[in-house]
């Protein structure tokens, strides 16, 4: 299940809407905050952000990247809050992304409470999270990028989730938790696995669809490492690999899923490169355009409002 067709289709869609927005003086602009100074996380996040920024610029938007990793830990939350409040007030900034995970000493809940819901392109503010508890619209709502991207990818390849047994490995706020809620809203039977889950292999082996969102490859982590291999899944399973980290010493990527062995068993499999990553980037573009319309509505003509 390549993410390339979805990514290319979304870029064309975004280009059209950038032109419409520019007609009323609004250029989509994404502001990105990097807060995590852990070497593995920082290198991985820089890679992700560079790709996201390239997408935005290619469709005609603009990007500002703020690295606060050199701010002392005791001041980093406060500096991030000041920055978020300034970005909230700026009309030229139409979308804000706090790159996750943030370090444990940063007050993540407070950051997302202060972030403008209208500019929240990862849909992680309390107000935007509420949509997951209702019937969401995958095409029109601001939804978490990776979970929504995964659902769009499954939809594109005709993979039905209704009534299927789905195992989500990882309960993170960015992917695992919101994805599980969204899958349940679509009438899937969902099991969520985490570090304390007993007999993980049983849940994985019985699943029709396995979504691995851990990001703790054995090459980089001694505590609770994870890799999904072909012997762990049943014949014909659909497998979606999300987690991946970069070794800062070598620049090499390591992923949740052993692609070669899983491919021998799976009916559908996302490639480690060019799979969920591209679907996530596609969804970020959609969310940025939606957020840009939120900013434009205060001054936009009725004709523009009908365009989206």
UniProtKB/Swiss-Prot annotation:
Q: Under which pathway is this protein filed?
A: One-carbon metabolism; tetrahydrofolate interconversion
User: Which GO MF term does the entry hold, naming one?
Assistant: methylenetetrahydrofolate dehydrogenase (NADP+) activity
Tell me which UniProt keywords the record has, alphabetically: Amino-acid biosynthesis, Histidine biosynthesis, Hydrolase, Methionine biosynthesis, Multifunctional enzyme, NADP, One-carbon metabolism, Oxidoreductase, Purine biosynthesis
**A Pfam family the protein falls into:** THF_DHG_CYH
What are the recorded Gene Ontology BP terms? L-histidine biosynthetic process; methionine biosynthetic process; purine nucleotide biosynthetic process; tetrahydrofolate interconversion
Which residues participate in NADP(+) binding?
170-172
The EC number on file is: 1.5.1.5, 3.5.4.9
Family (UniProt):
Belongs to the tetrahydrofolate dehydrogenase/cyclohydrolase family.
Q: What does this protein do?
A: Catalyzes the oxidation of 5,10-methylenetetrahydrofolate to 5,10-methenyltetrahydrofolate and then the hydrolysis of 5,10-methenyltetrahydrofolate to 10-formyltetrahydrofolate.
Specify the protein name. Bifunctional protein FolD
